[in-house]
């Protein structure tokens, strides 16, 4: 069986489930009722209505700032903001990402000139396929609490919640257990997961979405290849530089008690190993002309 990175874009599309970022975004934005139900399920809150969800909403505070995209960004009728992120790999910077995302949501929710008291309640939700914190919990729900007295809450209206899908069987409710079973690609038995399965199947019959997915995958492969080539060049240059520095250090240590003949002998050894005359000259202290003479002799 092929590893995920070995699959072609077409094979990835065939195997894609709701846990795939692209499929998740399309299903949620095309079905606001299911997005609303998912939020209520995850957060155990009641939502009267939501605006049409936005897939991969782009945020950029100013020209020089780092631009990012939210997977699914939605607001409800009271102005509360929700960002739902699918995280398929185990990354160590999720807490900082959540902090950054929450700040951007605050900027987005405040119209120009508005008072800070008008900041809306905001939720950053990560659906992680692996344990983001390694403590074996099914859910990590963070709130700002006073260090000296845990009874004192900051009540700044921000919420950061990380779900550990690998612990689907430990989720606090049956509905959550069924949803995260489905997210893991396992058989689930609930009306909600049945609806999700139908929508995922429908999404994968959409030729336009398939084309966008294939294009995105190909672009990502090109970017990864370019970055890999750039990194390989950097590493190669650093390895050459490290070797030269190591050779120079060895020569300088030995050269203190060396006669000129010994230096030339060492230079000949380097030349015999097909090391460039310029590098040999740099390491031995001989002039390039002297090294070339030795090479021709």
Question: How would you name each of these model-derived features?
Answer:
Residues 2-14, 82-87, 174-297:
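Short, charged alpha-helical interaction segments and adjacent helix-coil junctions
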